[in-house]
Amino acid sequence: GTSINVGKRGLLAIFTCILASASLSVSCSKDDTEKTLSEETASLTVTLNGQAPRTKAVVPPEDADELEKAENTVKNATVFVFNANGTLDKRQTLAAPSLSATISGLLAGEKRVVVVANVPSSVTFPDGINYSWFADAGNVIDLDTQSPETNGLFMSGEGTVTLSANSTAATTVSVSRVAAKVKLGTITVSPEAGHDPDKFVLSRAVVMKARGSATMGLPSVNTPELFYGGMAGDKSAEKSYLSETISADDHSNRYFYVFPNDNTGGNATLITLVGTYDGQPAYFPFRINDKPGSDGATSDGTFIQRNHVYTVNVTLKRLGGGSADPEVPADPASLTVTVEPQEWATELVQNVEW
């Protein structure tokens, strides 16, 4: 099927922004002012259009293209055309390979156009859906559904247009993934004095306190406390897809999909290395993008945002000083973090030390 491919260029603009025709006025901002609806009808042609892929996937080279294609593919999409006051004018479903459709019989005037793609089968949109429905924390998708190879990664986007009576306008709506991607980068074992590397065995990388659900609109917001992890924790319900077997010599090509998390309640999403030291369990949890950088580091401290990639490079020095809890990081003063802010098609790179 036809896929919508995502490129590097443009912060928070994964697809081409709004394309305007002579009879179409477009704004990237929201206007909550109610307009008087015209009884005259208009038509709108909506298209999802992407750029050539530039993402470097974290998989073996022979599989990289397939994963990239899966992450970028739009299998289906639903277009909602809302009036300025938030009530629904019309909606229409698009299915690959045809990701463009003309919606006729619309009321003239200002519109909000919302597009959702790769919608999980568990989601049902009400017949009388309102624009505010997408911001309701009770209307969410579950992290369990975010599999590029099967369902595709959920995407959403919106724009505003003004339709003229008895004419057809055309617009291309920008969409982006709600999920973010966490990649395990390098692991360097450089033991300090008193920490015997022969007593240390590294076995797994897990994500802990990943948000279990997310709202579908822009922006995606934190939903009621539901957390998943690669192992069970005080906060996290165990999910096998958040755990990867690793060793000190074999840890490349490991990645996870997670939902946005702004550290509400102090519950930042963590990447935790799991192992043993002298036969006893040892955990090395690290908050992801948890603070602004210093001394040349460019981290922004915004934790996890939608449609970003976070690569974490880890240096382990105090092998015998791991945490006893996979959800309790070390004192932040003991961590050195370097983050390079980038979008999904690029990456945020974080270097952490234990």
Outline where the language-model segments fall.
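Sec-dependent bacterial lipoprotein signal peptides
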Residues: 1-26
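Bacterial Sec-dependent N-terminal signal peptides
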Residues: 21-49, 184, 307, 352
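Structured, solvent-exposed acidic/aromatic patches
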Residues: 59-62, 70-72, 85-87, 107-109, ...
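Tryptophan-paired
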Residues: 63-128, 181-185, 190-306, 348-354
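Short strand-edge motifs at loop-to-beta-strand transitions and within beta-strands
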Residues: 99-101, 169-173, 310
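Structured interaction patches on ligand/partner-binding surfaces of diverse proteins
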Residues: 122-170, 283-296, 305
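C-terminal structured domain segments
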Residues: 281-337
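Protruding loop/beta-arch "assembly-hinge" segments enriched in small, turn-prone residues
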Residues: 333-354
